[in-house]
Amino acid sequence: MILLLPDFVGHPSCFQTLLSHLPEQVESANYHTLAMKEDLSELADLIADGLKYKPTWIIGYSFGGALGYELCQRNFPTAHLVMVDSHLPSSSLREMPVDEQYQHWLTTDIQDWLSLMQELNEIKLPVILNNISLFNQWQPKPALQQAWWIRCTRNNINVNTDWHLLIQYIHQFDASVCHHEVMKESSVISYLIKLTQGVTFS
């Protein structure tokens, strides 16, 4: 089973392009259908308890990569983790108020989409703000033998990329695309499909 973990917005629609290429046995988390937690590890436990099957692959986008790290450490040590442009919380982020981070992240296109989704009651702003807070407070411990990391190389500044301090071996794939577009990028989708199908990269 492949488990998909969205970014801090928390809605599985971010995986729409990828989902059309994956096998049927896929579960996508939707944070807006779950109880809000005070710690990222608690959210990981909640998601793990609700799964029908153990995942063989966990694909986490942005915030979802950090959540996937916790799931692999705590619940599914044999699962393969793919972090899609996920980063560690920097000191500057930890010091920035949650509301300010949220406003900094918004673009016009995203804001329009968020407004529509809130009107449809598909997403809830308190859940998004809580996810930002969970990430800011996250204190990861070295745990994993290996993981796959897709890194966006366009417009990526002031981010903490010290995953090598926590993961013994990182398979890195660079994509020349900005963070908001990475889950629609054809090279990234192709890479993820090959990974989950067990294709060997030369």
Predicted features along the sequence, with ranges:
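A hydrolase-biased, glycine/serine/histidine/acidic-enriched motif that marks catalytic-domain neighborhoods
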Residues: 1-202
